[in-house]
Amino acid sequence: MQVILLDKIGNLGGLGDTVNVKSGYARNFLIPQGKAVMATKGNVEMFEARRAELEAKVAEQLAAAEARAEKVNALEAVVIASKAGDEGKLFGSIGTRDIAEAITAAGVEVAKSEVRLPEGALRTTGEFEISVQLHSEVFATAKVQVVAAE
């Protein structure tokens, strides 16, 4: 199924690209999310008329994400207190939700879906560098310090 992308999508293409995708992916994800429209003659003309507006919107989102990334990078170490055993092993774990809430409490709005933990949840005390993906092209690094709760 041919669709016109209205947003940059990883491993697929950028704004304005006409790509061929499976019909289920287009019908169930891309079109309902507003990330693509079917590549009909009318939609192609409508897209060309709105191209500047859509490019400005994408540029604005990118600029906002870069501004948030600077704020996240400027943060001091975000401290999260959790119950821990004698050797620094946590009872439970620190996940993306906990990290997102701690960064938001420190003054920068971050959603849990933006926090990247490739090695999984944090299970020990110590300092960690956490990657935060604020946009498909914008990454920030937050320092998180996990301490044992009193």
Swiss-Prot record:
The species is Vibrio parahaemolyticus serotype O3:K6 (strain RIMD 2210633)
Give the InterPro entries listed for this entry. Answer: Ribosomal_bL9, Ribosomal_bL9/RNase_H1_N, Ribosomal_bL9_bac/chp, Ribosomal_bL9_C, Ribosomal_bL9_C_sf, Ribosomal_bL9_N, Ribosomal_bL9_N_sf
Q: What is this protein called?
A: Large ribosomal subunit protein bL9
Q: What is the lineage of its organism?
A: Bacteria, Pseudomonadati, Pseudomonadota, Gammaproteobacteria, Vibrionales
The family database entries (SUPFAM superfamilies) matched by this protein are listed as:
L9 N-domain-like, Ribosomal protein L9 C-domain
Q: What does this protein do?
A: Binds to the 23S rRNA.
One family name in Pfam for this protein: Ribosomal_L9_N
User: What family, per the record?
Assistant: Belongs to the bacterial ribosomal protein bL9 family.
Q: Which PANTHER family match?
A: 50S RIBOSOMAL PROTEIN L9
Please give the HAMAP family that the UniProt record associates with this protein.
Ribosomal_bL9
A GO molecular function assigned to this protein is:
rRNA binding
User: Example GO biological process term?
Assistant: translation
Domain of life of the organism encoding this protein: Bacteria
What PROSITE patterns does its record include?
RIBOSOMAL_L9
Please tell me whether the keyword Transferase is annotated for this protein.
no
User: Which keywords annotate this record?
Assistant: Ribonucleoprotein, Ribosomal protein, RNA-binding, rRNA-binding
Transmembrane domains' residue ranges: none
A GO term from the CC aspect = ribosome
